Amino acid sequence: MKNKILIILFTLLFSKIALAENVNIQAKKISIDKKEETTIFENEVRIVDDQNNIIKSDYAKYNKKLNFFTFKKNIILEDSKGNIFKSDNASYDKNNGLFKTLGKSSIVSSEGYIVETENVSLDLINNIASSKNLTKIIDLEKNTIDLDNFEYLSKENIFKSIGKINVKDKIGNKYEFSQIYLDEKQREIIGTDAKAFLNQKEFKLDERNKPRVFSNAVSIKGGQTKFIKSAFTLCDYREKDKCPPWELRAKEMKHDSKKKTV
């Protein structure tokens, strides 16, 4: 039948670990180059590996010698943890369990966090995804997190990053950090070397006020923000970052965005 989906079962032998593993491949079109030991799959390609990772694409090329896949166009990888990765160019080093995207990529985590980034490296053995490129994450509380890079530990449901980090919540409060942890299960953001710029009018005695909190660490969870070893001021910015005329210091300070209190 012309449109019949071809199903091919490859038994792949790994010399390093001396195990035989199966990969199921489906496609509507297939061509084989025996000399080069490569196989090309096109149209509705679907691959399921031994770890139940599912890869779909318009095009896939398999190199038998290297045990290596190359993918193009409309690539969707759903890993065994339920995370979904999308890109238009990717590769899969089956021997090392390493899946890589090239160019613009997106992720929807198993907990519903949305990630926009580039050049993702996914270790399917250790369940770790990472990118050294600029990244935007939107969490379930509609916080937008802009990062220089990220690492995602999918077993622990934790994102982490070190570098220039900016967070903006749904009511316009802005935070700057040098290091951040996003705990998906707890729906919590933890950051260090924090600067918080509060947007709520209730904190302003005058339109010129710039309510802000600087602290060693911050925890943001469920509409409440906890500042550790912090300083709070309403005063306007001063030239050359001089200290404000007054500030309130505390070992612990809390900001409730719903009650609009500090």
Q: Where are the regions a protein language model picked out?
A:
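Sec-dependent N-terminal signal peptides
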Residues: K4-F14
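Structural signature for solvent-exposed beta-strand/loop edge elements and short helix-capping sites
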Residues: A20-V262
